[in-house]
């Protein structure tokens, strides 16, 4: 309800499918009705129950994707929710992402239609339309080196330079 007030909208609460159907009937003349659910992890047993509530005619599911998420975790989310009919996404927390590559890659590979991005905590000021060129460009540059980027000393330790004489003796 607090988000509704911040956006200048009336927020309603639906505890079950019947209540949601009733509300959607009352709001049928509205141009846009947003349904916000509790966030659930891909393997959360409540996921199917929550998504079943949204299996109603005319309801389009948008998946909120954390831009700061780790690549394999994002892939897991996409697989779980795309299987349940999600084909559109909002890329959130872009301002918190150290690297955008994993999230942009995951959206592209899963062919998700990106509807917008969020760049901060202020609603609705920090909402932006998705700009493919800007996102791809941002994902290709890193403002800082990662702690996981190899350093020359590390590479020399794990992969010592080989000399021709040591290679001959190993054969």
Predicted regions located by residue number:
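Conserved beta-strand/loop subsegment of P-loop NTPase cores
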Residues: 58-65, 82-124
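Phosphate-binding active sites in nucleotide-utilizing proteins
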Residues: 1
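Conserved Switch II/interswitch segment of TRAFAC-class P-loop GTPases
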Residues: 40-44, 57-74, 97
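Switch II (G3) loop of P-loop NTPases
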Residues: 4-49, 55
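A polyampholytic, Gly/Pro-enriched intrinsically disordered region
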Residues: 33-37, 82, 86, 135-144
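NTP-binding/hydrolysis catalytic cores, primarily Walker-type P-loop NTPases
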Residues: 107-171
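Generic hydrophobic/aromatic pocket-lining and core-packing "Φ" positions
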Residues: 20, 50-51, 78, 103-104
